[in-house]
Amino acid sequence: MGPPRFALLFLIVAGLTALVLPTTAHGDLFISNFNSTLIFTDRLNLYRAVADQPTAVFPTGLSGAPYGPLFYYPTAAWLWALDALHVIDAQGWAGTNDESLRSLPAILALKLPNLAVYLAAAVVVAKTLGGERGRFAAELWLANPAVILFTLMMGQNDGWTALASVAALYFGLRALERDSGGPTLGALAMLCLAAGAAIKLSPIFLVPVFAWLIGKSYREKLLLAAVGAGAFLLVISPFLSTTYFWDYGLFGQQAGKATDLPSWAAALLYAGYLSLVVAAGRREGDRGQALLWSFVGFHALFFLLGGWSPQRSVLFIAALAVAVPARRWYLVAYVLVTGFALLAALEHRAELAAGLFEPLTARALLIPPLVTSSRPEPAHTLLFGLSGIAWLAALALAWRAPGTDGRRLPIAPLLLIAALPVYLAIASVKLPSGIDAMPYQTPARAQALAAGDRFSFYFISPQDELRSITFWVEPGGGRAAVSVRDDGGRTLAAEPARELVAGANEISLPRTERAAGHGFTVAIAPAAALSVRMVTPPPELALASAELNGVPVPGTAAFSAHYETTWDGLFGDALTRLRSAWRTLVVSLALCVAGFAGCYALVRNEGPATGG
């Protein structure tokens, strides 16, 4: 891409980023930042602090702190600095729904690390390949609508792991190019992988791969592997005595084992992948090409395992952004994976509804996710299959013909960025218009139950996968019959004489997939008097009803009123909020222009292409 068009792309993306950075957000952004403050307001061990909070485990079984320490502790340091400078009042936040936490100035401040990571990743991607190919790779990263959606709009942290991974690739390729200094650069690659794994686990599986391909002797290979594994263990060692960290921060669905496959099957596939890596390292030719092939191949394996949340696609797109300029065969996989990620976001708990509207209007929060919208499952399955086939085909072709023959497609990044507004418009149209339900604004009080009473509560799940449901019993506890049914009348769990303890009581469920938008009923019939209440829900669960002996409990919904959100109401709220926050938009524009200008200068002046 020539300098004028290259600069135009940066200008367009900078303007778009300045608009969406303070005005869009996902609930995970608020939960992660609120919980990060516990490090300096509660106790230094975050996972012990979170375990005592209502946000520790949601009624759906997912965690309020599902990531590794190298996300939360830098976030806490950033929040502490903002608090010390009186930009935010982090110590005054009452919870994840605090208005000051969800204000547009606060959202902008919270997302600045994501902006820095997004721009830094572009620079690293460019330097990894160098020259015109590096600039093209940076454009494919910066202009990708899925990357912008998940990293800058929703505020997800997968870009952090992507940055660590591509930085490891950069140092690994440099280590292979140099006759001297290789071990030091190789060690830096290992440290980057360890850092990425201490945010989200997947990069740890690249440690033996990089060690094998970078090390020039068996001794050097072992030392490099020890550096990567040792650095990772050193970072997580302070938390290994905390059960909550093992269950959620290390091996939980969100942070670690996301695949639907059994562990033995995933291990077998990984072993097969490692055998290909060993074979690639023994082939004649450029070892840098083998390292790049192995890097892209690992992310293809991760993609094909399935079970990951849509925001994980940022990792795959980063790998493919590096691969496309080197081998044009990867372009089809890049486009299909991007399309699959965007489609998955449409059907994944209405992420677009929350991400697009939540900071600008409260009305969208009153719409339960995906209750009346259709799930494009056939298209989802087809696109996933096509993406996997295209990726594997590109890897096979690259295996047969190692080398570099990437083709420049100057118009591609501009088409990518133009696709984002179109996609957001389509996503907006898919918002449900109404449902026969009315949300409650404050949780119901704890209910005193006598022997023979029947207390039940009903809620709509925001999660596709429901693993457990939690309720609280006031001091005393007791024995009760407990059952869980879905809205089709099927009994998912039934315990005729469960011993309830004071505090949280978690009901484990058989794996319940595609639960989003469906209702579930929990019924409790005590053998003796006790007091029980629902867990205080996060905003997306603030739609539920409770009954005592068949009579609705005050403070909950009876699911009888029809609620409808109008488009003029949504846009009216948004325009009012934007007008009142114009200063925040000006600050956002200034910061984005400065950040993109620095990124442009670094990427534009990138030297000639490397041989990797």
Language-model region placement:
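Juxtamembrane interface at the cytosolic side of transmembrane helices
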Residues: 593-612
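Transmembrane alpha-helix segments characteristic
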Residues: 285-302, 333-336, 559, 610-612
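Transmembrane helices and adjacent periplasmic/lumenal helix-loop junctions
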Residues: 157-159, 190-212, 301-313
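Membrane-interfacial entry segments at the cytosolic side of transmembrane helices
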Residues: 216-228, 328-333, 403-416
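Primarily membrane-embedded glycan-assembly and transfer machineries that use lipid-linked glycans
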Residues: 3-169, 173-178, 211-298, 345-391, ...
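N-terminal membrane topogenic signal
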Residues: 1-9, 408-412, 581, 603-604
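Beta-sheet-rich sandwich/jelly-roll-like modules and their strand-loop junctions
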Residues: 404-417, 421-488, 499-506, 510-517, ...
